[in-house]
Amino acid sequence: MKLKSLQLVNFRNYKKLHLEFNGKVNLLVGKNGQGKTNIVESIYMLSFGKSFRTNKDKEMVRFNSENLYIGGSFSKYNKYSLIELIIGKDKKGIRINKVPLQKIQELLGNLNVVIFSPEDLRLVKEGPKERRAFIDKEISQIIPKYYKYLTNYNKTLSQRSRVLKNIHVDEALLDVYDDTLAKYGSYIYILRRDFIKKIANISENMHMNLTNGVERLSIRYKNQINITDEDTIDTVYNKFLAKLSSNRPNDIESKTTRYGIHKDDLNIFINDLDARLFGSQGQQRTASISLKLSEIELIKNEVEEYPVLILDDVFSELDEARQKLLVNNLSNVQMFITSAEVSHKKIFDEKNVTIFNIENGDVISIENGGN
């Protein structure tokens, strides 16, 4: 799939902007604070309906403006579509081909986007929360109903937590919440397990290629409830419910839910050693690259087209060897790259690169390479 054009009105520091894109490499160049990341943020919004930088939509509305508009035309399965977002200070509207959507879930999976930022390079060494976010975001693109399950699970988890914080705990109400957590938690677990199996196979081969066969990458799903790979969804539900029940006295004492899929993690190993504890920074970064490239391949396998890739200030964090490792595996992917250095174009075949020079919320010049 390819993003063909982008239109912004009152988005961040852009009063009005219309861009036509290269189907291969789009290099957004400018000094810090000029608006490079704002453009890729708006592209991300077209895919997920929310920002990767803030949870507050109103922060994206240009100063002294009431509403913002983001419109993106893209091709998928040889068909053109238009996604539009209109965000005001108290409202948000999303349309696909002029048809209003009722839920974010309806947007997911239309324009598939993968973002690779400096934070992703720390995926291996960061905490479980970041790795769960990595899993959840990508499954939601492939299986939009997963987002519904996750939303319902988190809502119920918050409700259960409020009950646990009461002086007098309503255990009958906890019974209801425990059943709901086990129901949605079992759906989420099964979908995570299947996703991790698939990406584990891809990433093992990917990492072997990136390291010339020297390192073997393996990833495993870590859960707290002794669920096995063979367990059915009914077995997962029963184990989850039993764990919540047996641990309820501890939850009441600690006033929090200590067990569940909100505590799961992704264990990452290099040559059978925990990469988080024993991997060098270079090994951890190469493992992160392997996981992101595998994410792209998995989406391609599932939806039969490559996603759009955003590389937000990643090259500044990588040495030249790792820059080339990354780029050499992305020849079929449309890329949007933010950089303070125009010299990064030399990594690519220059005829495939369009350079957008950005200054103070405006694209001051465009250098075309390919189509």
Curated annotation (Swiss-Prot):
One of its GO terms (molecular function) is ATP binding. Keywords: ATP-binding, Cytoplasm, DNA damage, DNA repair, DNA replication, DNA-binding, Nucleotide-binding, SOS response. One of its GO terms (cellular component) is cytoplasm. PROSITE patterns: RECF_1, RECF_2. This is DNA replication and repair protein RecF. The RecF protein is involved in DNA metabolism; it is required for DNA replication and normal SOS inducibility. RecF binds preferentially to single-stranded, linear DNA. It also seems to bind ATP. ATP binds at residues 30-37. GO terms for biological process: DNA replication; DNA synthesis involved in DNA repair; double-strand break repair; SOS response. It comes from the Bacteria. Belongs to the RecF family. It is found in: Cytoplasm.
